[in-house]
Design a protein with these regions (language model features):
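Phosphate-binding P-loop
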Residues: 1-4
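Walker A (P-loop) phosphate-binding loop of P-loop NTPases
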Residues: 14
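Hydrophobic anchor at the beta1->P-loop junction of P-loop NTPases
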Residues: 7-9
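Walker A/P-loop
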Residues: 18
Length: 185
């Protein structure tokens, strides 16, 4: 049995988790998973189907998600991110997506996962845990660059406002709030 090495990368939205996680994974030859894309994929299904949002339907969607579903650039859109953050407050949906996340490293020598609760909930025994922080202004500029790449115009002020709202929601949700665990770097 392969016992994969798990590296957890947690942090705020647009803090650089994905960039850092991908660099580490590429350097080590490990697989990489942006776990936020799982929630965004569920949100995207609701947005594109224009169906009423329910947790039962979200769980049904989550059960059908495959890795290839996470390659869609539309998952990076603001609407997907905001709805994903709200859906992530559901304990039932989180439990379903935890299954996907915990199975991801199977049959691999190692995996890097980034998100909000990788080191605290998904893999509390991860070999290495990082918690990434960046100033709000830097994060807003990073997010603005992401938006520009997909043809979306925003003001830095508006992006900062949205990031603050997202930070508050992520840090204060009852289930798996964003926090820096004591053994994170």
């Amino acid at each position: 049995k392969i016992n994969p090495i798990i590296i957890a990368v947690d942090g705020l939205s647009a803090s650089g988790k994905g960039t850092i996680g991908k660099i580490i994974a590429n350097y080590l030859g490990y697989e990489y998973l942006d776990t936020g894309l799982l929630y965004r994929a569920v949100a995207f299904k609701f947005i594109t189907s224009k169906s009423a949002i329910s947790i039962d339907k979200a769980i049904d969607i989550a059960k059908k998600i495959r890795l290839k579903d996470l390659d869609n650039p539309a998952l990076r859109l603001e609407d997907c991110g905001n709805l994903a953050s709200k859906l992530a407050e559901s304990e039932k949906l989180r439990q379903e997506l935890i299954i996907f996340q915990r199975n991801f490293p199977n049959k691999k020598k190692g995996a890097v996962l980034d998100g909000r609760d990788i080191g605290s909930v998904i893999f509390p025994n991860a070999k290495i845990k990082f918690f990434i922080v960046a100033d709000l202004e830097v994060r807003a500029k990073r997010r603005n660059e992401e938006y520009k790449k997909i043809g979306i115009e925003h003001t830095i002020t508006n992006i900062e406002k949205k990031l603050k709202e997202r930070d508050k929601r992520d840090k204060t949700r009852k289930v798996s709030p964003l926090l820096c665990v004591s053994d994170a770097i």
